């Protein structure tokens, strides 16, 4: 199940819920707003973030945009394919275009994220 932030990041818990590993990316809405991505700057494995901290940067022909950590945790993997193929984020924003994986520090932070219905209501109110 995907969860979302008002800043247009998504999070999906991987494997067993008690493992606490989550995959993070930007939403289809965000990639559409940005346009074709030309560069993705990912965090280093082992980096720790608090919820809301800048974790990555995506650059398109239109603009650069920060990607925020939807929850606190430690980066355990990054999507190395994006260095050569940043357009994967456009083509598969919630699939092959994922950005990084976190070991979640506090699973309770996930509960405060938006579900799909709430996120759709949020984006319906935004221009785009």
Q: What do these predicted ranges mean?
A:
Residues 48, 66, 72-74:
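Beta-solenoid/beta-rich acyl/carboxylate-transfer cores
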């Amino acid at each position: 199940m995907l969860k979302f932030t008002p800043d247009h990041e998504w999070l999906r818990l991987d494997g067993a819920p008690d493992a606490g590993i989550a995959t993070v990316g930007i939403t289809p809405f965000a990639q559409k707003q940005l346009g074709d991505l030309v560069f993705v700057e990912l965090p280093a494995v082992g980096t720790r973030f608090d919820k809301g901290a800048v974790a990555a940067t995506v650059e398109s022909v239109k603009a650069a945009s920060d990607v925020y950590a939807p929850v606190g945790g430690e980066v355990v993997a990054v999507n190395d394919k994006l260095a050569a193929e940043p357009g994967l984020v456009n083509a598969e924003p919630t699939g092959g275009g994922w950005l990084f994986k976190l070991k979640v520090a506090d699973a309770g932070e996930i509960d405060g994220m938006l579900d799909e219905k709430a996120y759709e209501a949020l984006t319906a109110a935004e221009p785009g």
